[in-house]
A protein has these predicted regions:
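Transmembrane-helix signature of 12-pass secondary carriers
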Residues: 1-153
């Protein structure tokens, strides 16, 4: 009996995988960095927004910011029809760009309201990236390699 060799991946499939993997990696890195800088950032931003900056105030504001981020992420269902119309590759790139731009903008926030807006918009980008990355790899990779691609991702 001879073993069937797995289908070779082309350049586009490999690059698409690495784009999806990089997006997911940046998402994870963002979460870690955000957790590390949130308390010191809110200690400075809350007074600039006319709010107290005690421990309970920081915890409350941090919870609201996280909820807004998750609400943006929850809008990921909107990316499906957009990707069907314009293509997964373009939409995956757009979602990573949106996430990256608004994460960078969040670092430049002058008050808590700007931070809230930028985190919400970054959540929309990350939601699209999470929704489309796995789908893109599943659709772009050959059928006999899809499980492997999903496992690597």
């Amino acid at each position: 009996m001879t073993a069937i060799a797995p289908t070779k991946l082309n350049r586009q499939q490999i690059l698409g995988f690495w784009a999806a993997w990089s997006g997911w990696t940046l998402d994870g890195m963002d979460s870690v960095i955000y957790a590390l800088v949130l308390s010191p950032a809110l200690k400075e931003l809350l007074p600039q927004s006319g709010m107290a900056n005690g421990p309970a105030d920081i915890a409350f504001a941090g919870s609201i910011l996280f909820a807004l981020f998750l609400m943006g992420w929850g809008l990921s269902f909107l990316w499906g029809p957009i990707a069907d119309r314009f293509g997964r590759t373009k939409c995956l790139a757009a979602s990573i760009l949106i996430f990256s731009v608004f994460t960078g903008a969040a670092a430049l926030s002058q008050n808590v309201w700007e931070l809230a807006l930028f985190r919400f918009l970054a959540g929309i980008g990350i939601g699209g990236e999470w929704a489309m990355a796995g789908t893109y790899v599943a659709e772009a990779w050959p059928e006999d390699r899809r499980k492997q691609g999903a496992g690597y991702l």
